[in-house]
């Protein structure tokens, strides 16, 4: 037999082939640590409604973070720690990568939206920021989209050198900002006339800030604009996209082509060009001819991260539709439909309410879609529309309380979701300022509950026995009006008035930013 020849089965004897057949080890659960907090609330401090955070978004690089609040403001943060600070020799000595402490600092803020009133519909339009999306950077400038219920704005934030006016023709050395002379000795040196006047003529220019020198001006000097070395961040609104939605805007999403984006309300999805603010194209319209025939509304819409012709949108019936913009101008027909069929006999009054999808996110590679409804997270494979590949129970202990949640409208809360950049984990929020992180690799049992506080792992302490309800705890519940109506699966009390709706995962690192009322908490693993 020729030694150079071999049978096809010989490859199976190689070590790498044998290793490939072995079950792959599961990623170890991450230990999450507190990194930073901005706007931390003191004990007993009341939170102003306008300060509550309503949107969070990392940019594509992860070096900038934007938040929006109910007061219509956008706040920008930038990363200050160097991700490449370790030397090569230090990295070579490490057996495993060490989790670095990510640090962000306040960069700037600006008023994005103001409260308005629609006189034709007698409708108040609040200034609350619903969504923020980062756009592609250019010339060291930051670009982002922000929207409230009706109007989308395109912002440019750039550093500019501060310009000052120098070589003034008038003497400003003896004046101060409040219009009075800055030196008491100079004012006392003037001769005071019997009628209370002054021997020197004082000409009042704006706020008495400028004084003519004694004897008048001998020569005329033009002011000179001098550019200093100080830098100042200047936000500027480049475009305003308005009058295109009859219903409240719930989503905006940038296209991977860098030129277009979509905006979605309850019944329509519009396609915009970033440079054209007076024209948009309606690509999805689910409004029936008779509004009495309306059975579902659009809840969220998201572009595919790499395919500029593909987008997904979710509905209040729990379905997700994938559409291809190349099929037709008006995408009435979907390319794929993702929905989970309910078990026979399991339908109740609350089934459709809790099935409504509040948020969807594409994975970074575009292969999977993560969706959040009231009770669960679902992970979908876009190549398999028969059902989700994984379902994660977020707060199953609330299922017996659905009637109470319906009475106080908590059942309509819209929780967001996010995925890690490597696609190995997903996260979403819950009540009592808690959020949960799940491992989504096949066979993973990772399910971590974290609290938005300086001690995120506080809720991890096992509590096998249900605490006894003493007289003190009973009177506390009555006094607070039942804000803590029960306990979760671990025996910890839950508070429906404190809910963590908004969070975002860093695009390349295991770092999560989440909002608890007016406070922004950041964690890393």
Curated annotation (Swiss-Prot):
An example Gene Ontology CC term for this record: protein phosphatase type 2A complex
Pfam families named among the record's database cross-references: WD40
Cleaved signal peptide residues: none
Residue ranges, compositional bias (Low complexity): 171-189
Mapped WD repeat ranges: 48-87, 124-165, 244-282, 293-333, 352-390, 495-525
Start and end residues of each stretch annotated as Disordered: 1-30, 169-191
Domain of life (superkingdom): Eukaryota
Disulphide bonds in the chain: none
UniProt keyword list: Repeat, WD repeat
Single GO MF descriptor: protein phosphatase regulator activity
Classification via InterPro entries: PP2A_PR55, PP2A_PR55_CS, WD40/YVTN_repeat-like_dom_sf, WD40_repeat_dom_sf, WD40_rpt
Family: Belongs to the phosphatase 2A regulatory subunit B family.
Annotated function: The B regulatory subunit may modulate substrate selectivity and catalytic activity, and may also direct the localization of the catalytic enzyme to a particular subcellular compartment.
Complex formation: PP2A consists of a common heteromeric enzyme, composed of a catalytic subunit (subunits C), a constant regulatory subunit (subunit A), and a variety of regulatory subunits such as subunits B (the R2/B/PR55/B55, R3/B''/PR72/PR130/PR59 and R5/B'/B56 families).
Protein name: Serine/threonine protein phosphatase 2A 55 kDa regulatory subunit B beta isoform
Organism for this UniProt entry: Oryza sativa subsp. japonica
């Amino acid at each position: 037999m020729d030694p150079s020849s071999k049978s096809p089965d010989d490859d199976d004897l190689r070590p790498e082939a044998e290793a490939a057949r072995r079950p792959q080890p599961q990623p170890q659960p991450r230990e999450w640590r507190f990194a930073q907090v901005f706007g931390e609330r003191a004990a007993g401090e009341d939170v102003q409604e306008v300060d509550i955070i309503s949107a969070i978004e990392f940019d594509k690089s992860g070096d900038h973070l934007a938040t929006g609040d109910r007061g219509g403001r956008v706040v920008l943060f930038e990363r200050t720690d160097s991700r490449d600070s370790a030397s090569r020799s230090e990295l070579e000595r490490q057996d495993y990568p060490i989790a670095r402490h990510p640090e962000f600092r306040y960069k700037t803020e600006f008023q994005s939206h103001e409260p308005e009133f629609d006189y034709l519909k007698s409708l108040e339009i609040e200034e609350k920021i619903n969504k923020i999306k980062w756009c592609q950077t250019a010339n060291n400038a930051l670009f982002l989209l922000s929207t409230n219920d009706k109007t989308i704005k395109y912002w440019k934030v750039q550093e500019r050198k501060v310009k000052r006016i120098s070589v003034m023709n008038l003497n400003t050395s003896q004046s101060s900002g409040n219009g009075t002379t800055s030196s008491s000795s100079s004012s006392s040196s003037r001769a005071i006339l019997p009628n209370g006047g002054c021997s020197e003529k004082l000409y009042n220019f704006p706020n008495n800030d400028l004084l003519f020198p004694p004897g008048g001006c001998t020569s005329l000097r033009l002011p000179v604009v001098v550019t200093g070395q100080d830098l100042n961040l200047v936000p500027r609104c480049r475009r305003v996209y308005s009058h295109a939605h009859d219903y409240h805007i719930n989503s905006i999403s940038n296209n991977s082509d860098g030129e277009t984006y979509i905006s979605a309300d309850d019944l329509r999805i519009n396609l915009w060009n970033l440079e054209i603010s007076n024209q948009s194209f309606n690509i999805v319209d689910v409004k029936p001819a008779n509004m009495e025939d309306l059975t579902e509304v659009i809840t969220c819409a998201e572009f595919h991260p790499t395919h500029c012709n593909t987008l997904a949108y979710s509905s209040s019936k729990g379905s997700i539709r994938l559409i291809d913009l190349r099929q037709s101008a008006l995408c009435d027909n979907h390319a794929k439909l993702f929905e989970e069929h309910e078990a026979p006999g399991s339908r109740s009054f609350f089934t459709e309410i809790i099935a409504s999808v509040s948020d969807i996110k594409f994975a970074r590679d575009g292969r999977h879609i993560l969706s959040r409804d009231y009770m669960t997270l679902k992970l979908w494979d876009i190549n398999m529309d028969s059902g989700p590949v994984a379902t994660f129970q977020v707060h199953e202990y609330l299922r017996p309380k659905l009637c109470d949640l319906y009475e106080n409208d908590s059942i309509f809360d819209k929780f967001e979701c996010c995925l890690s950049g490597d696609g190995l984990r997903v996260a979403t929020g819950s009540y009592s300022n808690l959020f949960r992180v799940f491992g989504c690799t096949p066979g993973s049992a990772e399910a971590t509950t974290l609290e938005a506080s300086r001690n995120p792992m506080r809720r991890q302490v096992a509590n096998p026995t249900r605490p006894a309800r003493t007289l003190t705890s009973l009177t506390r519940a009555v006094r607070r009006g039942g804000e803590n109506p029960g306990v979760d699966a671990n025996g910890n009390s839950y508070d429906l008035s404190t809910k963590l709706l908004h969070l975002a995962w860093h695009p390349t690192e295991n770092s999560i930013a989440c909002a608890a009322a007016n406070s922004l908490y950041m964690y890393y693993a």
